[in-house]
């Protein structure tokens, strides 16, 4: 049971060009969630400096993410769209959570291990503490649900651990301050200030793979631009990339089982399924037995029809950066109001003078 008011939070880093995987795996899901939920969507620019401190185009990339949110259909009036650094309460709560969390928790994070590799002593403290800031991003609004991909599930589990430890460590203070609500964690009743945030995982294409290697996730950082379809790609670029996408010589199977061991075929079928809101089985019922020379043009047409309106609206918005800045500023003001209420209560719970 969760007695907290339902609230969805998610964020996207302003690093590299947004691509089809970001759209299908995250942004389109954000749009769908806003229909039945109160939502806060954040451009997490503070996270962007954890692995690379100096960026030449951070402001432009931040505007690009905001433009993509709005172009895809997110309503910045009904919901909140802002950039993380505009709300200093994120950093303040992250410091509290740094003191709640244990170093061992951070060092066990798979993403930290992957990014630090054998050079852990050379990476920033910010990269190690990334999950603590992510927990603060969510919990400074006491959000209850977060749409996440598989690569962020572990970080969300850590956010739950941090929330639970805070609730337990300060349980008496929370009650004495007249704050918190009664929830159930497992079978145990708990008086909690922070919710046990739940992941929202799923959708027809939660993982879109590289167009050049079906075993690797489509990535902003891949050196080959042919490996991904960027949201800012024009019709010619989309067509070229799909036509050059790696495939195998066999025809498409008639059943999903036949895609096993064929990662590139499975990726393209999965992309078609996601863009058309169909299942892979539906796609194979239509194209099974056909060669990629037939399937790829159909995929090009579908991708262009879905992405061109988003692309055009993004370009229109980016032509007027002051408008985007105004949207982010208004969203930041609304976000700060919520976050400051949380931090005032957290300060009281901890015992900070204010």
From Swiss-Prot:
EC number(s) recorded for this UniProt protein: 6.1.1.2
Keyword set, alphabetical order: Aminoacyl-tRNA synthetase, ATP-binding, Cytoplasm, Ligase, Nucleotide-binding, Protein biosynthesis
Record GO biological process: tryptophanyl-tRNA aminoacylation
PANTHER family: TRYPTOPHAN--TRNA LIGASE, MITOCHONDRIAL
GO cellular component labels: cytosol
Summary of subunit composition and partner proteins: Homodimer.
Reaction(s) the record says it catalyses: tRNA(Trp) + L-tryptophan + ATP = L-tryptophyl-tRNA(Trp) + AMP + diphosphate + H(+)
Intervals of motif 'HIGH' region: 14-22
InterPro entries documented for this protein: aa-tRNA-synth_I_CS, aa-tRNA-synth_Ic, Rossmann-like_a/b/a_fold, Trp-tRNA-ligase, Trp-tRNA-ligase_bac-type, Trp-tRNA_synthetase
Keyword Aminoacyl-tRNA synthetase: yes
Gene field: trpS
Stretches of the chain forming a coiled coil according to its record: none
Major site of localization recorded for this protein: cytoplasm
Binding residues annotated for L-tryptophan, in chain numbering: 137
Full protein name: Tryptophan--tRNA ligase
Positions contributing to ATP binding: 13-15, 21-22, 149-151, 208, 217-221
Motif segment ('KMSKS' region): 217-221
NCBIfam families: trpS
Protein's job: Catalyzes the attachment of tryptophan to tRNA(Trp).
Entries under CDD domains matching the protein: TrpRS_core (cd00806)
Subcellular location: Cytoplasm
Leading EC class: ligase
GO molecular-function term, one example from the UniProt record: ATP binding
UniProt family annotation: Belongs to the class-I aminoacyl-tRNA synthetase family.
